[in-house]
Amino acid sequence: MSQVILDLQLACEDNSGLPEESQFQTWLNAVIPQFQEESEVTIRVVDTAESHSLNLTYRGKDKPTNVLSFPFEVPPGMEMSLLGDLVICRQVVEKEAQEQGKPLEAHWAHMVVHGSLHLLGYDHIEDDEAEEMEAIETEIMLALGYEDPYIAEKE
């Protein structure tokens, strides 16, 4: 049986109203076991300042972002189940959900699904990569009982 170990770090000034650990676990379990038997993922929920700093340092973008993915590269000859870290910015997720008219829980789920696929090596830089990644995201989100996160773009 596939197992995803979650290390959840809540690093916001106010952690009230965030999804439960069980929800984060459910969202990870909907993605990762399809691609990898055992894995460990850290999800760190942060405020705008930390997201901004990390986005500037690692992507050269001078603003906070919804989710950052940091895949762990296992050294040759070692076997480890550590997949990597997701850093999700609470304020950006909440703002995007409101602006896009999406249920907040669904947008949180989408950020975990999207970030997890990045940890697994998927990307959306090229159009064909984006189509493949978005199709997988949509399939997983529908299986979780949420709407297609890209429905507005398809209409």
Curated annotation (Swiss-Prot):
Any one Gene Ontology BP term: rRNA processing
Q: Which InterPro entries match?
A: MetalPrtase_cat_dom_sf_prd (IPR023091), YbeY (IPR002036), YbeY_CS (IPR020549)
Cofactor binding, per record: Binds 1 zinc ion.
- Write down the top EC class of this protein: hydrolase
> What EC designation does it have?
3.1.-.-
Record keywords, A-Z: Cytoplasm, Endonuclease, Hydrolase, Metal-binding, Nuclease, Ribosome biogenesis, rRNA processing, Zinc
Q: Where in the cell is it found?
A: Cytoplasm
What Gene Ontology molecular function terms does this protein carry? metalloendopeptidase activity; RNA endonuclease activity; zinc ion binding
> Where along the chain is Zn(2+) bound?
H114, H118, H124
User: Which family is it part of?
Assistant: Belongs to the endoribonuclease YbeY family.
Protein name (database record): Endoribonuclease YbeY
Q: Which organism is it from?
A: Escherichia coli O127:H6 (strain E2348/69 / EPEC)
Output the lineage of the source organism. Answer: Bacteria, Pseudomonadati, Pseudomonadota, Gammaproteobacteria, Enterobacterales
Gene designation per UniProt: ybeY
